[in-house]
Amino acid sequence: MPNVLSDDEELLNGLGSEIMKPSRQGNHMARTVKRWVNKERATTADLKNVNIDGVHGPVNTESYISPGQLYSTDSGNLFHAGRILVVLVGLPATSKTLLSVAITRYTRWLGVRTKSFHFSEYKESAKNIPSDYFCVVPTSKEGVAFVEKLRMQMLNDILAFFNDLSGQLAIYDALNIRKIDRKNLETTFSEIGVKVLFIESIVSDQEIMNRNIALALESNDYKGLSTDEAIDEYMRRLSVNEPYYEMMTHDEELSYIKYINLGKQIIVKDNIHGYLVNKIVFFLMNLRQKKGCVYFARCGTSDKDNYIHDEELNEEGIHYSQVLKDFVLQRIKQKRQAKKNSDSLVEVIDGSHDEDLKTSLIVWTGPRKRTHDTALFFSKEGIKVQQRSELRQLNPGSIADLTDQQIMDKFPSEYKESLKDPYHFRFPRAESYHDLAVRMEPLLLEMEHTSKDILIIAHESTLRVLYGYLMACTCVELPNLNFTRDKLVEISFSPFCNTVELLNIPLTS
Amino acid sequence: MTTSFYDLECKDKKGESFKFDQLKGKVVLIVNVASKCGFTPQYKELEELYKKYQDKGFVILGFPCNQFGKQEPGSDEQITEFCQLNYGVTFPIMKKIDVNGSNADSVYNYLKSQKAGLLGFKGIKWNFEKFLVDSNGKVVQRFSSLTKPSSLDQEIQSLLSK
């Protein structure tokens, strides 16, 4: 029986090395600090208590650690990247808010302390709003003062985020259409060592334009107006700002990305460098407008629910598969019909792009028989089913198929440690949730890339990770999420946040 | 009453009749224009398109309209002078009209009935909305104010080659 080293002993001797005498000098292999700083105690999180994602939640908890985070540092900065300000550039309704929220979700998932600062939110909470506040150069004295005040508030909050809250990535969401505004931002933040990256969003595709304008008209800016009146008002605002729009060019000597027609084309200026910045670029290359939903379902049952054997479905499992297929297809049809009949212009536009289910729904399963066989009824309907190796369940290693009591008996010290940090703990020859999250990242990017409805049939462990990303959960919440067989989880997308709905699968019929 | 594009008629800037049957066999772009609009700089690109394809059978007609934000307040003479002086416009500018409402010009009533615009609405939403008509008199495309004239180059080229 090999000795089990404590954390401190392992750190002193270095991972994988022979045990050395404590008195030995100059051990350069040893890590000088623990891998995780300030772990937080686990608490239970129930799916039903939350139906809006946490992407706008605060990041100022000292002990905050993200699901996909590889390591932590005292300063909070990761990837040797220092601090970064992302500045969005573009006219109204060019998906700037969508971009800022998506980048926030993804980078937070990686562990970067990210926060978006939306001009529209500052305007919402202001008083005595002048009528020309939406102009980049307001005509009235009150308008000029108002816009300047909001800009100063935003700048001060961003500086506080960097300096007081150990923020690493701030996203500035406003028009920023003039060269002088961009130059000022670059100058202000360069002086304090913050790298500035501009992302210009351009929409010239009529279909995307229609949808974006419809979304914009649903904001508070246009409350009380009929749709016709709202469009006129929108065009008036656009008309006022259009003459001031200076598209980004090489001459400005700034780092920028042009994101055109929601990712159909991306132009990256050649002076962009740095691991984290390039990770953002890669993410943008995969980001697309979402029209469908993502659905999560467990697989059907087998006789022994055993990990070691790759079991087939039993009778109950086959029945579940049939019911699941009928329920999912019915739900998607229902939802699309509701879109066509909706009062919301966005929904009507989305509904008008309705397609045959065979081509607009895709089903992903894990590589194991139970998950794939649960999707057989979808295959019979002509719907594409793909086995994804990334959806392989968390590998339990030495504790495979053991009960909690058996784990306690056989691995008492490991069991105790696992309760302290269920997300990161790894049993012998097993994976941790963290390992699972890291290996699933390519799948997350692929989800961002598709605009179809997606149904994912998988083990609970993988569903937790996927849900955790889409709903911006913390790594404390993630291991405690519950996915039961009687529930279909539906996640809907909008530019500002994702929402979840739990649907009862009618298994008793 | 069934109307074809070529049955339409309007007044030119001098108040004289402009019959659309003279447009047969030509590709036509029709734009409601204004002198004090954020999109007014689109005149430059419209003129570039006109110069590039005029010899191949392409025509642009500009219809001044003061219905959106009071951005075309001048007289017909002032409008013509503005276009020529500021943008070197050589394509025809018609007499000022309404494009929406009970006084809407018959040309625009026809165009709006053929193609819906932004968000599916028939009404013209702002200055510099554009209709593209092929050489058979069919309204094939409608573009919002946001669409830059330079991005229409490909469409025009393919219609001219038919």
UniProtKB/Swiss-Prot annotation, chain A:
- Catalytically driven reaction(s): beta-D-fructose 2,6-bisphosphate + H2O = beta-D-fructose 6-phosphate + phosphate; beta-D-fructose 6-phosphate + ATP = beta-D-fructose 2,6-bisphosphate + ADP + H(+)
Q: Which InterPro entries match?
A: 6Pfruct_kin (IPR003094), 6Phosfructo_kin (IPR013079), His_Pase_superF_clade-1 (IPR013078), His_PPase_superfam (IPR029033), P-loop_NTPase (IPR027417)
User: Any additional notes?
Assistant: Present with 3380 molecules/cell in log phase SD medium.
Task: List its EC numbers.
Answer: 2.7.1.105, 3.1.3.46
**Entry's induction text:** Expression is under the control of the RFX1 transcription factor.
Which one Pfam family would you cite for this protein?
His_Phos_1
Q: What is this protein called?
A: Putative 6-phosphofructo-2-kinase/fructose-2,6-bisphosphatase YLR345W
* Intracellular or extracellular location(s): Cytoplasm
Respond yes or no to whether keyword Lipid metabolism is given for this record.
Answer: no
Q: Which residues bind ATP?
A: 90-98, 212-217, 415-418, 460-464
UniProtKB/Swiss-Prot annotation, chain B:
Q: What induces it?
A: By oxidative stress, dependent on transcription factor YAP1. By oleic acid.
Q: Where is the active site?
A: C37
What changing C83A does, per the record, is: Prevents oxidation of the protein
Q: Which cysteines are joined by disulfide bonds?
A: C37-C83
- Which CDD domains does the UniProt record give? GSH_Peroxidase
Q: Show the SUPFAM superfamilies listed in the entry.
A: Thioredoxin-like
User: What is catalysed by this protein?
Assistant: a hydroperoxide + [thioredoxin]-dithiol = an alcohol + [thioredoxin]-disulfide + H2O
Its EC number is 1.11.1.24
Give the protein's biological function.
Glutathione peroxidase-like protein that protects cells from phospholipid hydroperoxides and nonphospholipid peroxides during oxidative stress. Plays an important role in the oxidative stress-induced response in the presence of Ca(2+). Has peroxidase activity using preferentially thioredoxin as a reducing power. The redox state of the mitochondrial GPX2 is regulated by TRX1 and TRX2 (cytoplasmic thioredoxin), and by TRX3 (mitochondrial matrix thioredoxin). Involved in sporulation.
Q: What else is known?
A: Present with 2010 molecules/cell in log phase SD medium. The active site is a conserved redox-active cysteine residue, the peroxidatic cysteine (C(P)), which makes the nucleophilic attack on the peroxide substrate. The peroxide oxidizes the C(P)-SH to cysteine sulfenic acid (C(P)-SOH), which then reacts with another cysteine residue, the resolving cysteine (C(R)), to form a disulfide bridge. The disulfide is subsequently reduced by an appropriate electron donor to complete the catalytic cycle. In this atypical 2-Cys peroxiredoxin, C(R) is present in the same subunit to form an intramolecular disulfide.
- Which named protein is this? Glutathione peroxidase-like peroxiredoxin 2
Q: Which organism is it from?
A: Saccharomyces cerevisiae (strain ATCC 204508 / S288c) (Baker's yeast)
Q: What is the lineage of its organism?
A: Eukaryota, Fungi, Dikarya, Ascomycota, Saccharomycotina
